[in-house]
Amino acid sequence: MTRIRRGYIARRRRTKIRLFASSFRGAHSRLTRTITQQKIKALVSAHRDRDSKKRNFRRLWIIRINAIIRERVVEWALSYSYSRLIHDLYKRQLLLNRKILAQIAISNRNCLYMISNELYKYKEVEESSGII
């Protein structure tokens, strides 16, 4: 059986892989076998971390909203929290997601306070009229 020299095809494949791993350190950017292993590992990490990024940002938004809601204890609500705010939003059928609420909380706290006050006033009206 004759030997097949894999000239430019193999070289082209390796250079394509090396371009991907050019920013890696040490042997991870020089040796072909370790480059392929690190490429697989990098792509797996990227795929996994795209999902965890979504979870982390949702957690951050919830923490920000809760901190600002609890910061201002109003006379009508001795303990108003994130969970009560979200519950009241769902009852009123308001379409404000956590990302928008967190942006409002950071940029304009008074606006978030106004939203929570309106929700609570609506809640009082429902309870007094016996709609519940």
Curated annotation (Swiss-Prot):
Q: Where in the cell is it found?
A: Plastid, Chloroplast
Q: Which organism is it from?
A: Coffea arabica (Arabian coffee)
Similarity section: Belongs to the bacterial ribosomal protein bL20 family.
For this record, an example GO cellular component is:
chloroplast
One GO BP annotation is:
translation
Q: Which Gene3D superfamilies match?
A: 6.10.160.10, Ribosomal protein L20 (1.10.1900.20)
Alphabetical keyword list: Chloroplast, Plastid, Ribonucleoprotein, Ribosomal protein, RNA-binding, rRNA-binding
Question: What is the protein's major site of localization?
Answer: plastid
InterPro entries with a match to the protein in the record? Ribosomal_bL20 (IPR005813), RIBOSOMAL_L20_CS (IPR049946), Ribosomal_protein_bL20_C (IPR035566)
> According to the lineage, what is the superkingdom?
Eukaryota
Tell me the classification of the organism that encodes this protein: Eukaryota, Viridiplantae, Streptophyta, Embryophyta, Tracheophyta
Whether Phosphoprotein counts among this entry's keywords is: no
MF term (GO), any:
rRNA binding
| Entry protein name | Large ribosomal subunit protein bL20c
Role summary: Binds directly to 23S ribosomal RNA and is necessary for the in vitro assembly process of the 50S ribosomal subunit. It is not involved in the protein synthesizing functions of that subunit.
